[in-house]
Design a protein with these regions (language model features):
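Short, amphipathic alpha-helical interaction segments positioned at domain boundaries
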Residues: 173-188
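An alpha-helix initiation/capping motif
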Residues: 35, 145-146, 172-175
Length: 188
């Protein structure tokens, strides 16, 4: 913390099959230890006046990653260059990773139109990564009344989500196991 940084991203290392680190027999750490490290990181960064603004991100006031917040707000973005991805006019695309194709003007590897259902799922899955959660007025403008979503009401009643005047967000005690909440919004 002697570096006086303005922004820190933290992630648990997950060892994936068929990677060099997996092949070298490195094992994932115990979940309890991972959780203890998560709590320690939160405590230390809070002490350093870094704001926990997204599941894996902390910053000093005014130094939040605008680039990443654009993703978490489910907004459009362009991707330029090999392997880049973008999201424009409800269409997701991925550029080719092949340099020869790219230099010959064949930029897009694949693209698909995002359905209304998937847009709504993404709004919850991405928006609830933010500690502030989903802005209810912004949601209303995009999709209509947020109060009509059954799974949302169920999660609020179970105290996994919290609703205030302006936002719906994950109860802080469930942030570490956030994925177990977010999965409820897929195919709901």
């Amino acid at each position: 913390m002697n570096l006086q940084v303005n922004h820190i991203s933290t992630y648990s290392l997950i060892i994936e099959p068929n990677t060099k680190i997996y092949i070298d027999k490195v094992k994932n750490i115990d979940e309890d230890l991972d959780y203890e490290m998560y709590k320690l990181i939160n405590k230390k960064l809070k002490k350093e006046k870094l704001i926990h603004y997204e599941l894996s991100n902390y910053s000093k006031k005014g130094y939040e990653s605008k680039h990443n917040l654009n993703y978490w707000n489910n907004n459009e973005y362009y991707g330029f260059g090999l392997g880049a991805s973008g999201f424009v006019d409800k269409e997701r695309y991925e550029n080719t990773r092949n340099l020869n194709k790219y230099t010959n003007g064949i930029y897009i590897k694949e693209k698909y139109l995002v359905s209304d259902k998937e847009m709504l799922e993404n709004e919850f899955i991405l928006g609830l990564r933010k500690i502030k959660g989903i802005n209810k007025k912004n949601f209303q403008k995009k999709y209509g009344d947020i109060n009509n979503i059954k799974i949302l009401k169920e999660l609020i009643n179970k105290k996994k989500l919290i609703e205030n005047k302006n936002y719906i967000y994950i109860n802080p005690k469930y942030l570490y196991i956030q994925n177990s909440i977010l999965i409820n919004f897929i195919d709901s």
